């Protein structure tokens, strides 16, 4: 009797792990060298998986998250035992809040010596599990591959997030077998369709609305629903605002895309469709909407907690199906409402014009972004790693394609930028990748410029160097009349640090120097920093409470 089943191949567990990654389309793993990971490294080498090493495990994990943000394929980081895992915890917590599909493979002390005091011995799962969708320890070489498959599936299943597996060293070096089964991501089930009565209520509200608005967020991107959202916006003629990775789903120059008119649009809307973004501090915990605004919430899963204000319709499930069901030509063209918002948008932009050409020394952040925006290509990938300097970027740098805006998300973890930028450029080598950093943020991961140089990753960074922790200094002075622990060394030469590491670096202290310096940075073909001295007296005009 014949059989078509291929015989299982015998291999060490490290190669089995790599083979299961490869079967799901994983071709890059971010890491920092660690002996507990040698068998996984060997497996990756045998399977043709690229290893990218960083100078801190935090950056390896942030880079893996950045990879997932750009590609929507789970990013993978391999972190060594003990301090390697604890160093990656901030990135894991951030990815979990961002719903970024991130798989972390951990080294671990040999199981046969647990409790005996091995180097870097600790049980990772109890402290990783609270910031992960899935956390497990391989109990043998035989189940290592199965756990990798389960981790990949957990990372992408809504709500997506972090999956963690650690591999005791003795198991990782032991022999196992692979039967060549399909990759874990080859057949993923579609999400559920929202209840019909909720869809009917939502469609009815949108059809009768006179001043509708859509507020779209990152889960539109994770839900692969960008085309459905654009169709809904255009067919129902609904103005849209976007944050996070939804920026660019509707191009910034589309007549229905708004940003400066945000307060008016959200505050005066009679119906608001909130898609893929929670009512957290970014939406004033629901307070940005008018007291009589009818709210429709659409997301991939129902939140664990109640919304902070009543919702007329909750639509939970596959976002493409949801938004497609809401699309159509029902209702009016809302032309009067759209014209009101367009007028508000134009007036707000007119008020900015003086700042865009401000010749002050040190520079105004708005002048910095006016010069940079003129050099950015339409598909540029923009990475934000800053406080106030990043907020100005959010205001000034427009997005024209989805998946082009990478910020730290609601966890607000500084130091994420170099990892995100590293991954973005590796994933999209032909596109501009621009990292916008504050001088405070540079201190978290400045040595990663060595990583960028070693791997020949030509990211261009603009540092807003105002010598302070601006997001803390200005509010503290307003509250107390003084500030403490809010100053940095003025004029620090971060550009010289980058040059010493092998990159391109320039200092800009006057406005006339900025455009030529940016042009040279883009033309250098090297990882580049333009270190711009900015005015420490300028505070971003916040309207919301971050807490």
UniProtKB/Swiss-Prot annotation:
Disulfide bond entries: none
Region (Thiamine pyrophosphate binding): 388-468
UniProt KW keywords: Acetylation, Amino-acid biosynthesis, Branched-chain amino acid biosynthesis, FAD, Flavoprotein, Magnesium, Metal-binding, Thiamine pyrophosphate, Transferase
Pathway assignment: Amino-acid biosynthesis; L-isoleucine biosynthesis; L-isoleucine from 2-oxobutanoate: step 1/4; Amino-acid biosynthesis; L-valine biosynthesis; L-valine from pyruvate: step 1/4
Presence of the UniProt keyword Ribosomal protein in the record: no
List of residues binding thiamine diphosphate: 57
GO biological process: branched-chain amino acid biosynthetic process; isoleucine biosynthetic process; L-valine biosynthetic process
EC number assigned by the record: 2.2.1.6
GO cellular component entries: acetolactate synthase complex
Cofactor remark: Binds 1 Mg(2+) ion per subunit. Binds 1 thiamine pyrophosphate per subunit.
Annotated binding of FAD, by residue: 159, 299-318
pH note: Optimum pH is between 6 and 7.
Catalysed reactions, semicolon-separated: 2 pyruvate + H(+) = (2S)-2-acetolactate + CO2
Family, as annotated: Belongs to the TPP enzyme family.
Complex formation: Heterodimer of large catalytic subunit and small regulatory subunit.
Name the record gives this protein: Acetolactate synthase large subunit IlvG
Organism: Mycobacterium tuberculosis (strain ATCC 25618 / H37Rv)
Gene name of the record: ilvG
